[in-house]
């Protein structure tokens, strides 16, 4: 939690240090691995971030939050097709939450498929919110 708070405050190096110190190498926690990946994404270390997202997925296969964050990593780079692949996989998981589905709607909309994006978004939102 401390590492995430530091990252939210823009203190990425301190956040990275906190997350790494909290990790137990013998029994890695997928949440900490994913948090470290997200921080590396913020530091524009995409390759290292994606490697860690994949490690988190090895520890917790098909975890929607990790798949979604991996997809967002590709969004930040402008690779919307790859991003959509990960986002769709995330959204199809039984335990996917609203944020995951909204991220899918975002990446579909960024590709100009507005009707499809609105349909995805409207599953969670009022019609007015989905059109916004």
Predicted regions and their residues:
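Helix-start (N-cap) detector for alpha-helical repeat units in TPR-like alpha-solenoids
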Residues: 29-31, 64-65, 98-99, 130
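Canonical tetratricopeptide repeat
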Residues: 1, 35-36, 69, 103
